[in-house]
Amino acid sequence: MARVTVEDCVEKVPNRFALVLLSAHRARGISAGAALMVDRDNDKNPVVALREIADDVIDHEGLKEHLISTLQRVDEHTEAEEEAETLALLADPSHMQMSELELVRALQSDRDGGQEERY
């Protein structure tokens, strides 16, 4: 069997940087136990991933979307909870009745307490 080259893969994925990301992601998936789409032929996982890309046996867009979802660090559930908490605070007018002196004291105590916690 001929060795897979980057030129074979660049025809399928034109951006070399995207090719590296996709093939590395696929190789990690193979290491985690994903089913192989081509025969291994005693090749290592990165080579198998490149051969799968070159042979066009995997869905590039699906692989790209899965890669993006694994790289995202936003937890939508946490974001929704924070937004609900903010809306609840805005709906409660009791915290708006703080005097200027009380506000300054609260800010200073937060500032002073925050420095002690860091050390």
Curated annotation (Swiss-Prot):
* Name of this chain's protein: DNA-directed RNA polymerase subunit omega
Q: What does this protein do?
A: Promotes RNA polymerase assembly. Latches the N- and C-terminal regions of the beta' subunit thereby facilitating its interaction with the beta and alpha subunits.
What keywords are annotated for this sequence in UniProt? DNA-directed RNA polymerase, Nucleotidyltransferase, Transcription, Transferase
For this UniProt entry, what's an example GO CC term? DNA-directed RNA polymerase complex
Can you tell which superkingdom this protein's organism belongs to? Bacteria
According to the UniProt entry, the coiled-coil residues are none
- Family according to the record: Belongs to the RNA polymerase subunit omega family.
Instruction: Write out the catalysed reaction.
Output: RNA(n) + a ribonucleoside 5'-triphosphate = RNA(n+1) + diphosphate
Mind listing the GO biological process terms from this record? DNA-templated transcription
Q: Which InterPro entries match?
A: DNA-dir_RNA_pol_omega, Pol_omega/Rpo6/RPB6, RPB6/omega-like_sf
Q: Which GO terms describe its molecular function?
A: DNA binding; DNA-directed RNA polymerase activity
User: Under which main EC class is this enzyme filed?
Assistant: transferase
Its Enzyme Commission number(s) read 2.7.7.6
The record ties this protein, via Pfam families, to: RNA_pol_Rpb6
- How does the annotation summarize its subunit structure? The RNAP catalytic core consists of 2 alpha, 1 beta, 1 beta' and 1 omega subunit. When a sigma factor is associated with the core the holoenzyme is formed, which can initiate transcription.
